[in-house]
Amino acid sequence: MGVPFPIAGRQIALAIDEEDHAHDGAEMERRRGRPHACLWVFDVGDPAHIQPLSMFEVSELESPWSRAAPGRFGAHQFHERMDDDTLVYCTWFAGGLRIVDVADPLAPQEVGHYIPEPAPGQAGPQTNDVDVDKRGVIYLVDRGPGLNILEFKRPK
């Protein structure tokens, strides 16, 4: 996603490096220690020389359901519109919603998160999609429990 305004003097774009998921506990165990999908920040000021600036990752330790098979953990999707703010709203499967500030594109910082409880009989949440309306209301979709409607107050 291209950001429609410069941030810290740079024209940036964001991308999510989505990974395959483990189908069972044994496969999840083999993947232990590997990096998960993350949020990438690129300088796209010169399209002929796109440069990676940074990546934002979430540790498995940040979610009690990160290793709940047959689930997924890692970046999945982000809200695909940035109007005049530097906040990026990302879904992280079992890591829930992550709100990341890219005001410093070299060092993105998490400023908020929400992890829904899994649905009954589900090993962990699988947060799948996020949308944010013009009022700042967050609509978070999980494959199990369904829809969460949230508000976020940016820290001062």
Predicted regions and their residues:
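Feature marking well-ordered beta-strand scaffolds used for ligand recognition
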Residues: 1-156
